[in-house]
Amino acid sequence: MQTEHVILLNAQGVPTGTLEKYAAHTADTRLHLAFSSWLFNAKGQLLVTRRALSKKAWPGVWTNSVCGHPQLGESNEDAVIRRCRYELGVEITPPESIYPDFRYRATDPNGIVENEVCPVFAARTTSALQINDDEVMDYQWCDLADVLHGIDATPWAFSPWMVMQAANSEARKLLSAFAQHN
């Protein structure tokens, strides 16, 4: 895969430039554009993934299915499809917006900061998974209600962005409706 960049944003969310992805994520990460996706199978189960130990931020942490950064000239939806293919080797239905104005800042225990405008999407898988071990060390298909209960009971076991997304009542409602619509 070619070198990825992040699209830097000002406080109003307007693009101001780009920076190489790994150089962008530091203890003083600038606001940038990202996306987050929750993938479901035909049974309505959510794919929860565990980040590879080689990841710069939150290694080994359980999270929602796939996250990433759109590239210049790429729509968020196309970026979701690209990263699903790269990380999971999977084809998906067109991504649907779940939480378009999600924005967060969180600091990893090693000091790396995420500072993102991060629209959230849901999609269904349409092929078998072919996991990229450089990205994902483990995965599990789970009932959404069980995952949400786990997040509520043990938020420290999940990525902060997943916890914050699940805490939004409208996003939770839309994810539940998406999971039930087979």
Curated annotation (Swiss-Prot):
Domain of life: Bacteria
Binding site for Mg(2+): 67, 87
Record localization: Cytoplasm
Signal peptide: none
InterPro entries found in the cross-reference section: Idi_bact, IsopentenylPP_isomerase_typ1, NUDIX_hydrolase-like_dom_sf, NUDIX_hydrolase_dom
Reaction catalysis annotation: isopentenyl diphosphate = dimethylallyl diphosphate
Domain Nudix hydrolase: 30-164
Active-site positions on this chain: 67, 116
UniProt KW keywords: Cytoplasm, Isomerase, Isoprene biosynthesis, Magnesium, Manganese, Metal-binding
Pathway: Isoprenoid biosynthesis; dimethylallyl diphosphate biosynthesis; dimethylallyl diphosphate from isopentenyl diphosphate: step 1/1
Residues bound to Mn(2+): 25, 32, 69, 114, 116
UniProt-listed PANTHER family: ISOPENTENYL-DIPHOSPHATE DELTA-ISOMERASE
Subunit structure, interactors included: Homodimer.
Function: Catalyzes the 1,3-allylic rearrangement of the homoallylic substrate isopentenyl (IPP) to its highly electrophilic allylic isomer, dimethylallyl diphosphate (DMAPP).
Entry similarity comment: Belongs to the IPP isomerase type 1 family.
UniProt protein name: Isopentenyl-diphosphate Delta-isomerase
Organism per entry: Shigella sonnei (strain Ss046)
Gene name in the database record: idi
